[in-house]
Amino acid sequence: MTQYTPMIQQYLKVKADYQDAFLFFRLGDFYEMFFEDAVKAAHELEITLTSRDGGSSERIPMCGVPYHAAKNYIEQLVEKGYKVAVCEQVEDPKTAKGVVRREVVQLITPGTMMEGRTIDEKENNFLAALTHFEDGSYALACNDLTTGQNTVTLLTGSVEDILLEVYATGSKEIVVDSSFSKDELNKLTETLKMTISYEDATAIPEGLEHLVKNVSQAKLIKAVGRLFNYVIRTQKRSLDHLQPVEIYYTNQFMKIDVHSKRNLELTETLRTKEKTGSLLWLLDKTKTAMGGRMLKQWMERPLIQKERIEERLEMVETFVNDYFLREDLKEKLKEVYDLERLAGKVAFGNVNARDLLQLRRSLLQVPAILEAISLLDNAYAARLIQGADPCESLTELLGRSIQENPPLSIKDGDIIKDGYNDKLDQYRYVSKNGKTWIAELEKRERDITGIKSLKIGYNRIFGYYIEVTKANLGALPEGRYERKQTLANAERFITDELKEKETLILEAEEKIVQLEYDLFTALREEVKVFIPKLQHLAKVISELDVLQSFATVSEEEQFVKPVLTTKREIFIKDGRHPVVEKVLNGKLYVPNDCIMPENMDVFLITGPNMSGKSTYMRQLALVTVMSQIGCFVPATEAVLPVFDQIFTRIGAADDLISGQSTFMVEMLEAKNAIANASERSLILFDEIGRGTSTYDGMALAQAIIEHIHDQIGAKTLFSTHYHELTVLEDSLDQLKNVHVSAIEENGKVVFLHKIQDGAADKSYGIHVAQLAELPDSLIARAKEVLAQLEGQEEIVIPKRVEVKEQEVIPEPVVVKEEPVAIEETKVDNKEESQLSFFGTEQSSKKQDKPVLDVKETAVLTQIKKIDLLDMTPLEAMNELYRLQKKLKKG
């Protein structure tokens, strides 16, 4: 290192402590980067890569960005998952001896960003910390630095379960200890796409002990300690806005794994990954940013306590029934600023005068909001606003201190109102009246000298001066004026009186700006005292905002209040898929009932492709989620149990499990449901078994249905194209066949989208292909093949018969029994050549035909119908195996 210049040595010394971050090294008006940082940053930011002499034999790669534009460049890097260490000059270069002292003042990471394009106002920006213990358990702590919110929970289960809970937090960055295995880290980085950071310290930092007063479990404290130590190490500033840690337990909320959340499109759509088109998009009628964040949190964790759900529903009902109360509340909420994030800005010291003005305007709405809610005859409402302080003294303080239209910068003055500070008023009087005095002096000097063109001006070099044209110099009295500057056509002078006033005026203006800055920073410190009250107020207002949002959307979309029951029954009359109905935008939507009494656990759903089976299944799940977050539901009547979990297998393969086939993903998600579901769960399986051969798929589907029916007892919707499975209704007493109806008119299929009792008779797949405008020749060929297949052998479904208690053996049951016609026709040359593919010698027409029994003749007939050109090699092998197996049977 000694071969480098002192400045580069300083850079390398600082960089050594921030190896995993870009180091923005302040040099004058630029942040510079060197060596590998420069090469990588130039590529990522698309800026010029240059070089400089650093004292060694080779020039050092270098790139830089202007300090006033650095924020944008930092955001770009953090958006891509990088960290940025900001190294500032911490002493005046003019007074520095040797190299100017520099220090890292902040480490900006994906999980600690306070503002920027990546921070959605209606989403939290959580930083997660995961701690692994020897007994296999984990503790997960999360912090949103923008709001000060802190949570912690204890997790048990498989690594996959832990990762899914981490994923559910939406964290972009996770803090672990240095002993984490490479396998675990790979899952975090590759599967969850998170930035990894390290922190080994787990003791609660000094000064933050009060935040964990309600946390007694050592494991949870360690996780929180790791989180807090990392935040302190990276932020290097006040954290007065951090809120007490909230403990949550995953068994206190409905469990919806990340696959199911995505399949149901709760907060984002599967296709675009955007909010628009999701359930959150439909339900979000919130008027505040903090209300929007709370709504998303509620949707991530629906309640399972019946009493708490009913409390919310009653408040929503109150708002639905009182239009004027709801509309008045909405108007007031529109004026409420993001109190949570403002508290964070106050604590961090980056709040400006406009922010405080917005705070005052927000607080002006609070007394009326609290009063209106206090008048409600509702215990939940009374408990909600209990302890909420409208902070009227803060409102008054901000009202008499901040100007109505302050500038963005707090260093430009014109922030503080007149009358707030006596000294400031005096300076302003001098500044204002000093300029008036200058104007009066100019008039007086003109009168004394008789020079009408005499004027008093100002510039930064000479200050105030009296300017007289050369033609009028003879009119000046001797000894009164001191020459200051000579111009081509004029002379500039000063007087003792002018110099004295100049000093007063300029000092006053400088002192005004500095004093206003000092007064504002002092005011900011006073506001800090109110942070806990503001945060409590924010929670109250957020909750009211979510409840009015539910009421607003419920009235607009004609939702109904669900009745919660302790029985295991579902009664939904005229249920609708809320998002599909909204997207149809007034077009006719076909509602459907879902009636499953206590003795009915499984709906086996058959019906045409594109008829609405998946929509019907999602509809039930969304109605359930809406009910358990406290919202009305899309139906004319709804009686629902409280479900503990929702499991779904709907749609295409989930990219979270990268590299797996659709069938493997189906099996993994089926396993998850089978292993974890209870009789209080809801299971939605769409076309399980489609990713393998027909027989394998059908066998697996039947086995899964039977297991759910016999062993779990969960309410289940199971859609299938295996119509042969509908005979299970005869052997499974808590299973019912339902189908989505369709009719044929003039050779075309019309989907009625109506759920009816009984099994469907057709899938109408070819009709769907016609709708997709596949070639006519292909459609015609498909119809030929379908006719051939429908004439083939019957499919036998194993029926269970009771032999003794809890012992079941299969007994074949014929689903479709149509005798296969035994053809006596001659085999032509073409057919002979096809048979030779299976090892049979070509026969001459003159030779005698072999004598075949009935079974062999039936197989021969089926072979004749096979078109190998329309089959893949694998399909051909499967067909050969099936026919061979048929021949071997006795």
Swiss-Prot record:
Cystine residue pairs: none
Binding site for ATP: 607-614
Keyword Metal-binding assigned: no
Gene Ontology biological process terms, A to Z: mismatch repair
NAD among keywords: no
Keyword tags: ATP-binding, DNA damage, DNA repair, DNA-binding, Nucleotide-binding
Gene Ontology cellular-component annotations: cytosol
Family: Belongs to the DNA mismatch repair MutS family.
Its job: This protein is involved in the repair of mismatches in DNA. It is possible that it carries out the mismatch recognition step. This protein has a weak ATPase activity.
Protein name as annotated: DNA mismatch repair protein MutS
Lineage: Bacteria, Bacillati, Bacillota, Bacilli, Bacillales
Gene that this polypeptide is encoded by: mutS
